[in-house]
Amino acid sequence: MNRRANPRYLAVVTLNRLEESEDFLKDLVDSQIQRSSLSSLDQGLYTELVFGTVRMRRSLDYALSRFSSRPLEKIQPAVLNVLRIAAYQIFYLDRIPPSAAVNEAVKLARAFGHEGTAKFTNGLLRQLLRGRDLLAYPSLEEDPVEHIGLKYSFPTWIVEQWIKWWGVEETAGLCAAMNEPPRLNIRVNTLKSSPEEVRAHLQSRGISVQSGRYLPEILEVRPAHAVVADDWLEEGRYYIQDESSALAAHALQVEPGQTVYDLCSAPGGKATHLAQLMDNQGQILAFDVSSRRLAVVQENAQRLGISIIRTQVGDATEDLGLSPVPRVLVDAPCSGLGTMGHRPDIRWRKSADEIRQLVAIQKQILSRAASYVAPGGLLLYTTCTLTKWENDEVVQWFLAEHPHFSGQPFPEEFPGGPGQPWERTLFPHRHFVDGFYMALFRK
């Protein structure tokens, strides 16, 4: 077995590393591909196996546990990952014959274990093949939390909260949408190109291009990986950004010549979009606690041909000593649950306790931001998550604590809902973008 060129072997290696480290899954995958000898075709299979197995981990473990002669926690972690990858192919990859998935898994179990683990793997997977059509989830009517959690592979606590906030039907639709193949949006940099030029360029390279749903500068491209090696991306003619995030810059209603504060800026997607909408005229002060992350903001601005962004290291929970300006953006640190379609590892790494700690930080930042807004100015609060703890409840608290601010209604055509006129929640199954939240205030 040439391990550096075997997508299944490398998938197991990556899953093992994910469990042993705090690195993001995407970073582990990118690093592994760079070190491997995988063909372009096998890179696609490797990526599908890793992301798919992580995404559907709870569902896969449920299926494996029904046919295993021993508890899953008693199985060697690497061998359990072999079993998960094989089960993922059996349940979700029609193009791979089940027998091939089993045979390859047996080889991997031998490589990561011994002859005994190979025999155990063979027996378990063949039982799963024989009984998979009889596998059943708890009833949706009798136990909706377990049904949705097991069917769509989500932690119980997330499903419980979403059902509490939005009901069973909405939660099932939301979870299903989070498991769909993620689309890729790009934002055309109108300082350098037009949407028509970028569309024609990408189509000439055999890339499928569709218009965004809400914004003229957004395009949707398939396959997603096709733009990574494109010269136009390096030249700054476009920027990879989900349409939900791009809506934020429009919500702030900036004008050329204004001064804008972006208090949690890195990696700079919203700051560079604001500069684009300001026609590169005015000033944007971009803050972040990390100088390393601010360097990424500077690199992105330079590549996009933007000269009005100035970066400054600063902790937005503390007083930055800033003079009031017409526009302030708080893209708050959050749990990121709205991005689980692109980042499936998030669902297994976040907890309700961690979110409660984030809420305290979000309130601190928003309170500090209030003092930087000039009378009549706008303050925009955004997150890429779907918890009312971090969204609606933070906003309700802010308005109660800061009576000199009021909610500023969004234009009626602005997508999102339900909520107050000054709030917009974007749902993947309703709006076909990443989960996102915005609240707009006027001082």
Question: Residues of each region from the PLM?
Answer:
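S-adenosylmethionine
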Residues: 1-443
